[in-house]
C-alpha cells in the first residue's frame, strides 16, 4: 500500500484512499497493530493509519505539497475508527450509515446513532466525510433512480448539519453510472452533476467514475473515463475518484 500510494502521489494524486479489507464493516471491534494481509484491501487499524500518514508525509516533502489520506469509518465501529483517524491525522473518511443498512443488514437504530457520534468526532477533527450514494447505482439504474441519489444527499446533508459538520466537510456522493448506450446520456450525466453542484454549492462533492458498464473494451473504457473527467471539471466537483 505504501509503495502504491507514494507512486500515485508522484503521478499527481491529491488524496490516497486505502481500501478496507472485505468484511471489516461487520467486525464489532477494531484490530490492533500493523497487519500484513487483507482480502481485497487492508485492515483499518490505528497503526496502519500511522504508517500510511508517515509515508505520505515523506513523499509530500519530496514533492513539495501535502497529500491527503482517506479511509473508512462505516459498519459496526464508526466512532472508534473516526477517533483513530482523528488521532493519526487522516483528512477524509467514508462515513455513511445507509450503506450498512441497505447492503450489510446492520441494525438501523444502532448504526444511525454510531453515525451521529462519528460525525461529531469528524467535524471536530476537521475531517471531510464522504457519503456512499454511488453504491446505490450498482444495483439500481442511474437514469431511472437518479432522484434517489439526490434524496439521499439531502438526508445526509441534514444529518451532517445535526452533527456539527460544516458544508465544506460534506463530501456528498454521486456517480457517472448511466448506461453509455442511453440516448443523450452524456447530457443527462452533465445535467445531474451541475444540478448537484448548484443544490450543494459549498459542499466538497464526491464524484465517482463509471464502473457498472465497464466492459473488456479498453478503448470504450478510456472514452467513458474521459467523459467522466470532462464533466467533473466542467461542473466543479470536489473530490473526483480515479
Model regions: which residues?
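Anaerobic metallocofactor- and corrinoid-dependent redox/one-carbon enzyme cores
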Residues: 1-242
Amino acid at each position: 500500500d505504501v509503495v502504491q500510494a507514494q507512486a500515485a502521489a508522484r503521478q499527481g494524486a491529491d488524496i490516497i484512499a486505502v481500501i478496507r479489507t472485505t468484511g471489516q464493516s461487520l467486525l464489532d471491534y477494531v484490530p490492533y497493530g500493523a497487519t500484513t494481509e487483507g482480502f481485497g484491501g487492508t485492515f483499518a487499524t490505528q497503526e496502519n493509519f500511522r504508517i500510511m500518514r508517515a509515508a505520505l508525509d515523506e513523499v509530500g516533502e519530496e514533492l513539495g505539497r501535502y497529500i491527503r489520506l482517506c479511509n473508512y469509518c462505516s459498519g459496526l465501529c464508526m466512532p472508534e475508527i473516526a477517533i483513530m483517524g482523528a488521532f493519526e491525522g487522516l483528512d477524509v473518511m467514508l462515513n455513511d450509515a445507509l450503506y450498512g443498512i441497505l447492503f450489510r443488514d446492520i441494525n438501523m437504530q444502532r448504526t444511525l446513532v454510531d453515525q451521529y457520534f462519528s460525525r461529531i468526532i469528524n467535524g471536530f477533527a476537521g475531517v471531510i466525510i464522504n457519503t456512499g450514494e454511488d453504491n446505490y447505482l450498482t444495483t439500481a439504474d442511474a437514469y431511472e433512480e437518479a432522484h434517489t441519489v439526490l434524496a439521499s444527499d439531502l438526508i445526509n446533508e441534514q444529518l451532517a448539519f445535526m452533527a456539527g459538520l460544516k458544508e465544506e466537510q460534506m463530501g456528498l456522493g454521486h456517480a457517472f453510472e448511466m448506461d453509455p448506450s442511453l440516448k443523450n446520456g452524456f447530457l443527462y450525466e452533465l445535467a445531474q452533476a451541475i444540478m448537484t453542484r448548484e443544490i450543494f454549492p459549498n459542499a466538497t462533492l464526491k464524484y465517482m467514475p463509471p464502473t457498472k458498464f465497464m466492459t473488456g473494451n479498453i478503448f470504450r473504457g478510456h472514452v467513458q473515463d474521459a467523459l467522466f473527467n470532462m464533466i467533473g471539471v466542467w461542473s466543479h466537483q470536489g473530490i473526483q475518484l480515479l
